Amino acid sequence: MLIGVLVVALLLAVPVPAHSAESPAPVHANHQLGTPVSGPGQGRTDPDQARPLQWLLHAQGQDGGWGPEANTKPDVATTSLSGIALLRLGHTPSSGEHRESARKALMFVIRAVERSPAPEEFIEPEGTLPQRKLGRGIDTFLAAQFLGEAVKLMPAGEDRRRASAALELCVSKIQSAQRKDGSFSKDGWAPVLSSAFAANGLYAAKDVGARVSPSSLAKAEDYMMKGYDSESKTFRTADSAGVALYQAAGALGMAARAGTMKEAPAVAAREHLADEAFVRGFGSYGGEEHVSYMLSTEAFAKAGGDDWTKWSKSIRMRLAAIQREDGTWRGDHCITSTSFCTAASLITLAIRPANTPQQM
């Protein structure tokens, strides 16, 4: 009897390891390479897009912004990513079933930019979840991409004028933030993704005639391509929290934008992204994984061909497997925000090669 009591006491005294927000969730022992870990969407091969879109629309605040969850304080980065999702699904500030939601998101971002007119000034107060993980400038970087994509789809008028002016200011802020090595951020948990979004913002701005410095884009490309070490044939991870997926996604996205998909970093990225362990990134699905899939899917779509077909099928199966019962996606580590992860996944699912229609 005494021995039994002592055994129970010892068992209770043994600490149980906890999985923090920074540590990956355990992988099931029967997990096979090439197949995502099963989840609520087990058995599905294509994600539901209608329910996550409805959730995202419902989660939008009265002021037009999105926070990490429904009915939470909004931030510019999450709002911009959610706005891009609406645009990609055909809901612009002036057309589409959910045009009013898109316009409210646009005006939320425009007002935030207008409140911070100095070129070096951040447009969002410090302390948001995207900032902590991707760096202080992520709001500006994503705002530029959202504004650039929105302006392209808007008719002439006051809204477009304000959006264009806000975009020009974001471009100034982004170029002021660029460092000597071509990066745009060294703070946050995985700043390489922030630099990838900064470059995306500049390209989106350039596409609609904003004043973007060619040297700034050249430096950004050089920085991202140097993230691949051709001698060791690996991706450097100093700016990607030790996760090669983030660096590879950034490099591949940049190569697609710059037209250098045949160069070594892009070729290596495509090869690595065919490996299940590599695609798992940190080991569980945080917002960083979701945006890495988004960046990679953009690049594969630009290239087209068999690589696109294989990647598209695999990423859609993966997102179907980890989709939650209510249709949303949520991060397992770091960027855990339902709004952020759901928006990123909707963008991924909306991406198609040129001249291929979007399907819902």
Regions found by a protein language model. Name each.
Residues 18-360:
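Preference for long, amphipathic alpha-helical scaffolds in soluble/luminal domains
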